[in-house]
Amino acid sequence: MTPVHFSFTSAFILGLMGLAFHRTHLLSALLCLEGMMLSLFIALSLWALQMEATGYSVAPMLLLAFSACEASAGLA
């Protein structure tokens, strides 16, 4: 596992652990969800760049759109 993959995997796991342990406060739970979505977005973007597949380049943008919808629904 390269250091880049390790850092994004650990960022996702830290966000997941923060979500599991900070369920009492809504804002901290939403921030943990945003951290998880951001690490997934960067990981999917890097994966599409490494594979040099243009068909997979749409997936990070869809994930970013769903993440924005999740954040706006949570803060409403």
UniProtKB/Swiss-Prot annotation:
Transmembrane helix in keyword set: yes
InterPro entries: NUOK/Mnh_C1-like
Transmembrane segments: 1-21, 29-49, 56-76
Reactions this protein catalyses: a ubiquinone + NADH + 5 H(+)(in) = a ubiquinol + NAD(+) + 4 H(+)(out)
Protein name: NADH-ubiquinone oxidoreductase chain 4L
Enzyme Commission numbers on file: 7.1.1.2
GO cellular component: mitochondrial membrane; respiratory chain complex I
Domain of life: Eukaryota
Alphabetical keyword list: Electron transport, Membrane, Mitochondrion, NAD, Respiratory chain, Translocase, Transmembrane, Transmembrane helix, Transport, Ubiquinone
Enzyme kind, highest EC tier: translocase
Function: Core subunit of the mitochondrial membrane respiratory chain NADH dehydrogenase (Complex I) which catalyzes electron transfer from NADH through the respiratory chain, using ubiquinone as an electron acceptor. Part of the enzyme membrane arm which is embedded in the lipid bilayer and involved in proton translocation.
A Pfam family annotated for this UniProt entry: Oxidored_q2
Primary location recorded for the protein, binned into one broad class: mitochondrion
